[in-house]
Amino acid sequence: MPLRPGRCYRHFSGPAYTRKEYIPGVPMPKITKFTMGNVNGNYDYELRLVALEKGQIRHNALEAARVLALKQLTNKTGSDQNFALIVLKYPHHVIRENKMMAFAGADRLQDGMRLSFGKPIGTAARIERLGDIIMIAKVKKEHLEIAKKAFEAAASKIPLKTKIDIVPIPKEAVVQ
């Protein structure tokens, strides 16, 4: 079966479904790297991708946003030593799907909504508070516009409304 659109899983109701020790067959999340670039570098600005609404972000959307931001930052700054990119949200929540058949005679083969709990098909990160930070990038002043464009592109992969906050990093904090 093909992957359902992200709008099917954007909103949530009820508690998170996270206990993987009780759930057989949970697929691994596509996103595996959460810190990229030179994390120990000396940077001037911190860019934050902030969620403006509550919802869920599927693991493949997080991975797509990460790959796009990383590729743009690496290609346009010249090296992965000129920035630090950190994904803060982890896809803990297990997403289920009650598969339905859609062909002639399917009503004789399936049970409809009887026993409709569903099988695990993926994972999602939950954004439960407004203003939660999804990703952070740290850059020097000369790469600020490049990082802003990379985050605008990455925000298009996230199924929620987002904004980009730019915070200058104080110099005394860097020295410590």
Curated annotation (Swiss-Prot):
Signal peptide bounds: none
Single GO cellular component term: ribosome
Keywords: Ribonucleoprotein, Ribosomal protein
InterPro entries: Ribosomal_uL16, Ribosomal_uL16_arc, Ribosomal_uL16_CS_euk_arc, Ribosomal_uL16_dom, Ribosomal_uL16_euk_arch, Ribosomal_uL16_sf
GO-annotated biological processes: translation
Keyword set includes Kinase: no
Keyword Mitochondrion: no
GO molecular function terms noted in the UniProt entry: structural constituent of ribosome
Entry's family note: Belongs to the universal ribosomal protein uL16 family.
Record-given protein name: Large ribosomal subunit protein uL16
High-level lineage: Archaea, Thermoproteota, Thermoprotei, Sulfolobales, Sulfolobaceae
Name of the coding gene: rpl10e
